UniProtKB/Swiss-Prot annotation:
F-type ATPases have 2 components, CF(1) - the catalytic core - and CF(0) - the membrane proton channel. CF(1) has five subunits: alpha(3), beta(3), gamma(1), delta(1), epsilon(1). CF(0) has three main subunits: a(1), b(2) and c(9-12). The alpha and beta chains form an alternating ring which encloses part of the gamma chain. CF(1) is attached to CF(0) by a central stalk formed by the gamma and epsilon chains, while a peripheral stalk is formed by the delta and b chains. Its EC number is 7.1.2.2. The gene is atpD. This is ATP synthase subunit beta. One of its GO terms (molecular function) is proton-transporting ATP synthase activity, rotational mechanism.
Length: 476
């Protein structure tokens, strides 16, 4: 292996000089710096500066590095453990375990984090719906097995909680394998998620990879590739359907922006790296379904200052099959999950995929909510009395629909004191169909807030002192 030495350290950027008589390392190769006392730091080659000097990005803290320290070229990219043994374990960007358990032996199978996307002829398209048990998603923006889904929202609107609920529901109801990748988010949230999943028994079907916000930009930029590499093994070798959760894909872009500036590249719009679209494409094109298996990706996407035209979320949009948009106004109204039913969308909301009844109910729900939005200006200025009788009925049903789109989550039980609910798609469709038909016009609208199916809403109404009318009994 080629040997070099450290010649310059600027934060996470390390310049390494190799003799021109030896083979220079390739771009993306892993280099190891020996700090002494059995301590090493892993670098990744990013640029060749000339005269045998390679500019690298450190995957760890560069504290303690000095000029002249010996550097060894590994002759390959960073590689990480893959296989069934990774389930139930927690890794960092380098594939080292960080859960206090045993390290994987040196001869364990490892794959490179830098790989090509599957070839065109290997790809497979699927139109099978993935049931999540979350009403607003299953009804209005259904997820496709093997698709890419984006959870958009500003700070504190519930992206991470929604991802945790999806992991819980898919593990409990579908028994599927999941890979959770924490990219540049809070370490506390990752710690909470680990112990919650351990207690609920979901962890044994999940591999977790973390590169959190206190780590170097190199680690945050590459950790998504580490998680994806573990998921690709289950797809390509085991032939399984895998769920890949990334929280948060914006931090991947943000880390890339930091690295780009450190490498001296000229920034583009809003200070982002000029290679933004390329980096995003290289990651997203690997997240796909092949004839062997599928990777269904659910990505939380932070929207800076709630601005959807920002280049980071806008670049991500192009790769998605479905978008789930979280709205701060709904959190202020106490509607959770705060999914905006009019701005969320899915390519799978098609009668040939979800069925004619589901499609018609979803379309009518969106129509009623859109009409309610249009009437809100009149209501706020002139009051409800200025509406026609038909418009008053639309407003009443829209409010019931809006509340019924909310539900309690299993992962939030400790905070809310309310049991979470998983609602099958057929129950969701039949419930909204009955509300649209006017079967529950006399049921108090508050009864529909944060409940599971229609039966739960009627039980809540009964607790509120409501007695079913003969019409509702007949329809029920």
């Amino acid at each position: 292996m080629s040997m070099g030495k450290v010649v310059q350290v600027i934060g996470p950027v390390v310049d390494v000089e190799f003799s021109l008589d030896t083979d220079l390392p390739d771009i993306n190769n892993a280099l190891t710096v020996d700090k002494g006392n059995d301590e090493t730091v892993v670098l990744e080659v990013a640029l060749e500066l000339g005269d045998g000097v390679m500019r690298t990005i450190s995957m760890e803290s560069t504290d303690g590095l000095r000029r002249g320290m010996p550097v060894e070229d590994a002759g390959r990219a960073i590689n990480v453990p893959v296989g069934k043994e990774t389930l139930g374990r927690v890794f960092n960007v380098l594939g080292e375990t960080i859960d206090g358990g045993e390290e994987f032996p040196a001869d364990f199978r490892r794959d490179s984090i830098h790989r090509s996307a599957p070839k065109f002829e290997e790809l497979n398209t699927s139109s099978e719906i993935l049931e999540t048990g979350i009403k607003v998603i299953d009804l209005l923006a259904p997820y496709v097995r093997g698709g890419k889904i984006g959870l958009f929202g500003g700070a504190g609107v519930g992206k991470t909680v929604l991802i945790q609920e999806l992991i819980h529901n898919i593990a409990e109801e579908h028994g599927g394998i999941s890979v959770f990748t924490g990219v540049g988010e809070r370490t506390r949230e990752g710690n909470d998620l680990y112990f919650e999943m351990k207690e609920s028994g979901v962890l044994e079907k999940t591999a977790m990879v973390f590169g959190q916000m206190n780590e170097s930009p190199g680690a945050r930029m590459r950790v998504a590739l580490t998680g994806l590499t573990i998921a690709e093994y289950f797809r390509d070798v085991e032939g399984q359907d895998v769920l890949l959760f990334i929280d948060n894909i914006f931090r991947f872009t943000q880390a890339g922006s930091e690295v780009s500036a450190l490498l001296g590249r000229m920034p583009s719009a809003v200070g982002y790296q000029p290679t933004l679209a390329t980096e995003m494409g290289q990651l997203q094109e690997r997240i796909t379904s092949t004839k062997k298996g599928s990777v269904t990706s659910i990505q939380a996407i932070y929207v800076p200052a709630d601005d959807y035209t920002d280049p980071a979320p806008a670049t991500t949009f192009a790769h998605l099959d479905a978008t789930t948009n979280l709205d701060r106004k709904l959190t202020q109204q106490g509607i959770y999950p705060a999914v905006n039913p009019l701005e969320s969308s899915s390519s799978a909301l098609d009668p040939e995929i979800v069925g004619q009844e589901h499609y018609e109910v979803a379309s009518e729900v969106q129509h009623v909510l859109q009409r309610y939005r249009e009437l809100q200006d009149i209501i706020s200025i002139l009051g409800m009395d200025e509406l026609s009788d038909d418009e008053k009925i639309i407003v009443a049903r829209a409010r019931r629909i809006q509340f019924f789109l909310s539900q309690n989550f299993h992962v939030a039980e400790a905070f809310t004191g309310q049991a979470g609910s998983y609602v099958p798609v057929k129950d969701t469709v039949s419930g909204f169909k009955a509300i649209l038909a006017g079967d529950y016009d006399d049921v108090p609208e508050e009864a529909f807030r944060l409940v599971g199916n229609i039966d739960a809403a009627l039980a809540k109404a009964k607790e509120m002192g409501y007695t079913q009318s003969e019409k509702a009994v007949d329809q029920d």
